[in-house]
Each structure stands twice: as C-alpha cells, then as structure tokens.
Amino acid sequence: MTMCSGARLALLVYGIIMHSSVSCSPAAGLSFPGIRPEDEAYDQDGNPLQDFYDWDPPGVGSPASALRDAYALYYPADRRDVAHEILNEAYRKVLDQLSARKYLQSVVARGAGENLGGSAVDDPAPLTKRHSDGIFTDSYSRYRKQMAVKKYLAAVLGKRYKQRVKNKGRRIAYL
C-alpha cells in the first residue's frame, strides 16, 4: 500500500465533508437523524431561536407550484392578459398569411385556377390559340390569371405587397 500525500488526504477529507453536508442538508429534504438537539436554543436576549429542522422553506412543494408562484409574481394577471391578446392577434395574422400563401401555391400549381370548379375531368386536348393572329395564347391567359390571383392575395395580405411594388426598381441589399 502506498502512502498518501498530505494534499491527497486533505482533499479526501474535504470531499467526504462536502458530500455529507450536501446530502444531509435541509434543502435536500433530509434531516440530521442523530444530531438533533432536544433543548431549545436561545439568542443573547433570551428569545427562542427558530427551529431549522422543522422549518419548511418556501418552494419545498412541487417544482410546478414554485414555477406558478414565480410566474404570478413577475407577470401580474392584467399584463399577462394584454400579452396574450397581442400574441393571439399576431398569431392570427401569421396564420392568415400562411393560409393565403398556401392557397396561392395551390392555385398556381393547378394551372392558375382553370379547374376551380373541382371537376375531376381534365381536358386532354392540347392548348390551342384563342385568336387567329396568334397573339393571345393559352399560356398568356394563364399568366394573366396568375397575376390577377397574386394581386388579389396581395390586397388581402395588405401592406407588404405595396412596399414590394414601390421598391421594385431598386433592390436593397441586407447585410
């Protein structure tokens, strides 16, 4: 067996003391079984001291109740209601925008809404020209329908489209 140096021995004793003080502390919920004094302790003025062994610190209950108490303390009910109202309003706006975008994507994916009635019968005939001079083709009419749907959805979505059209000529690079 090798001899331990003084530093190792001191570290070992320190570790044992720290382990016993942490595992037997009142905060851990354990009591000192054999060290409890039977007599009351008094301070300098003769007043009885508080019994720390029978005292339950606040928050010893469930962690969830401690979180609720802290939440109620830092966030009063009136401020919480205002915050929830603002959050719900912003959430509704985001959901409206997402649903409008999803609708736009579905319309564009279907071919600009040519089959909006929901009929399952697709016309297998190839695209034909609408006028004899060939200026207006089906692809151009499809493009016009797409632009009409985009403008309508932009009007529904609001201000964002106006800013995009306003800044169309100049592109701003964001860092």
Curated annotation (Swiss-Prot):
Phenotype of null mutants: Knockout mice show delayed recovery of axon regeneration after crush injury compared to wild-type mice. No difference in motor neuron survival after axotomy compared to wild-type mice.
Cellular component terms per the entry's GO annotation: extracellular space
The keyword Signal is annotated on this UniProt entry: yes
GO biological process: adenylate cyclase-activating G protein-coupled receptor signaling pathway; adenylate cyclase-modulating G protein-coupled receptor signaling pathway; insulin secretion; negative regulation of cell cycle; neuron projection development; neuropeptide signaling pathway; positive regulation of chemokine (C-C motif) ligand 5 production; positive regulation of cold-induced thermogenesis
Pfam families: Hormone_2 (PF00123)
Stretch forming the signal peptide: 1-24
PANTHER family per the UniProt record, alphabetical: GLUCAGON-FAMILY NEUROPEPTIDE, PITUITARY ADENYLATE CYCLASE-ACTIVATING POLYPEPTIDE
Role summary: PACAP is a neuropeptide involved in diverse array of physiological processes through activating the PACAP subfamily of class B1 G protein-coupled receptors: VIP receptor 1 (VIPR1), VIP receptor 2 (VIPR2), and PACAP type I receptor (ADCYAP1R1). Exerts neuroprotective and general cytoprotective effects due to anti-apoptotic, anti-inflammatory, and antioxidant actions. Promotes neuron projection development through the RAPGEF2/Rap1/B-Raf/ERK pathway. In chromaffin cells, induces long-lasting increase of intracellular calcium concentrations and neuroendocrine secretion.
Protein name: Pituitary adenylate cyclase-activating polypeptide
